[in-house]
């Protein structure tokens, strides 16, 4: 998947996910020649910021290979300075045109946050920090009248998209220039489908 533009990059990922869902992956960019070609430099087309859940392996569900995607993962795709720095590196140094926020159903971080708010079950240690970072998304969702877990999961994805634009000047500049786009997506564990939830910038669809 060559370095491209947001529209072409998003199409490549959609096509790859369609192959994965159909059980017909091509497993591209995984041969000896591809591996050798990446020893000196990388030119990924997309940066995927996703949840650390072991069931949500970005390269597999988008049917991509070595050097195709720059992947950043945290539990609940929560943002901190290291995450922003990693994504900005991909955007400013590697010139990646597309940022994908990848959430999923049955998200433990969202469920833990709901339990903390509703039942006072606040986790200990650094897990508490994850819950605290997801909490604003849940509160915004409740203010909007959301009630189902899947609605809160989508809300958290959309809020993450908004936060990336608001907190990173580099990302905001790329969006303003039309050289970058951000998509918010959720992955369905049962059928493997990636669903578009929101986007900023031109990705070739409404």
From Swiss-Prot:
Keywords: Isopeptide bond, Lyase, Metal-binding, Ubl conjugation, Zinc. Zn(2+) binds at residues 51, 53, 104, 107. Binds 1 zinc ion per subunit. There is a cross-link at residue 11 (Isoglutamyl lysine isopeptide (Lys-Gln) (interchain with Q-Cter in protein Pup)). One of its GO terms (molecular function) is carbonate dehydratase activity. GO terms for biological process: carbon utilization. Catalyzes the reversible hydration of carbon dioxide to form bicarbonate. Belongs to the beta-class carbonic anhydrase family. This is Carbonic anhydrase. It comes from Mycolicibacterium smegmatis (strain ATCC 700084 / mc(2)155) (Mycobacterium smegmatis).
